[in-house]
Structure formats: structure tokens, C-alpha cells
Amino acid sequence: MLPSLIQPCSWILLLLLVNSSLLWKNVASLPMCAMRNDRCFMFFEDTFELAGSLSHNISIEVSELFTEFEKHYSNVPGLRDKSPMRCHTSFLPTPENKEQARHIRYEALLKSGDMILDAWENPLDYLVSELSTIKNVPDIIISKATDIKKKINAVQNGVNALMSTMNGDEENKNPAWFLQSDNEDARIRSSYGMISCLDNDFKKVDIYLNILKCYMLKIDNC
């Protein structure tokens, strides 16, 4: 029997993932759901297969965005300052790595991913908006950031639906680096910090969802 937490809303995540049109060229030919009592039930295995694949692809794209941004603005003073920057998600009680995540119950692991995704809802909007106003920013950076935002939103909406039976929504607070400044270098460093945090956080989400995929699909050696 499937876990009660997952069954009712798993079809929402799959629809959102499919609509993101990532990786799946022939998905239209696949059965989208099984009808039962006039309701649509998604195939459980497909949900986690797609979620894991999409999250991994997003993680790669965020890392590429970070590298491109760092390379383009490498001459900005203080960009690579080694002093630690506190990300707005650092207070969240989530596993830091794959080893920790392996020892977490799947419900708690899904909740960890949900908390990170929810915490990035407003910052993602801000990041894309801010990047478009920075002087001489390459179009490819804006395009990638916009595409990443859409794909992350798809995963976020699906995971939120899965978590809807748990605690109510927590307030999303703006990160400390939500700043309004006329100093171009300061704005570039702020955006760089945001992308760095997003890169780190989505590596975690990728780990969580793929551990869940392996757990639910009984895949060895993940």
C-alpha cells in the first residue's frame, strides 16, 4: 500500500513536471493517469522518477549559472570574498549532505525539500528581476535564471501539494541581501551571493528527491 501522505496529490507534481517540458519529448504518448471513481490517479513510480530527474537537471543548471555569473563578473572587487555569507535558509533544520539525508524518514526528507523550496519563492522572483537591471549582464544569464525559476516553481508547487496535509505555511522572510543600492558592484555581489546560496540549496533538494525516488522505487546503489 502506498503511504497516505503521498497518494492523494502525487498527480499534481507529475503534471507540473511534465508541463515544464524538460527531458521528456515523447511524454504525450504515455498514459497520464488511471481513472478511478471519476478521479485521476498518477502512477506513483513515474512521479518520483520525474521529480528526481528534474531536480537533478535543475541542480546542474544552477551550478552552470553560478559559474557563468562568476566568470563574467570576476573583476568586481570583493566578489570572491572568502568571508562566509549567511544564506537565508541556513536556519532551516535540513540534512546537510547525502549521508545525513539517508538517515531521515522519507516524510521528514520530503518536508526538508518543501521548506527549502518555499523559502526560495520570493527570492527567486527578486533574483530574476534584479539580474535584468544589472548593467551589461549577458542575455544568457537572464534567460537561464528565468528558465530555472520556472522549473523550480514546478517542483515547488508539486511538493507543496504533497505536504498540504502537514503544518501550515511558514512566513517567507526576505533575505538579508535583499537590498536596494545605487552601487552597481554591491548589487552584483548581492546577486552573486544569492546564486551561490541557490546552488548550495538546490544540491540539497536534488539529493533529497533522488533519495526518495530510490527509496520508493526500490533502486539499489543510488
Curated annotation (Swiss-Prot):
GO terms for cellular component: extracellular space. Expressed in placenta (at protein level). Expressed in the tail hair follicle, with highest expression detected in the keratinocytes of the outer root sheath. Expressed in ear skin with lesser amounts in small intestine. Not detected in brain at 18 dpc, postnatal day 25 or postnatal day 55. Glycans are attached at N57. InterPro entries: 4_helix_cytokine-like_core, Somatotropin/Prolactin, Somatotropin_CS. Residues 1-29 form the signal peptide. Pfam families: Hormone_1 (PF00103). Disulfide bonds join C33-C40, C87-C197, C214-C222. It comes from the Eukaryota. N-glycosylated and sialylated. GO terms for molecular function: hormone activity. Keywords: Disulfide bond, Glycoprotein, Secreted, Signal. It is found in: Secreted. SUPFAM superfamilies: 4-helical cytokines. PANTHER family: GROWTH HORMONE D22-RELATED, SOMATOTROPIN,PROLACTIN. Belongs to the somatotropin/prolactin family. This is Prolactin-2C5.
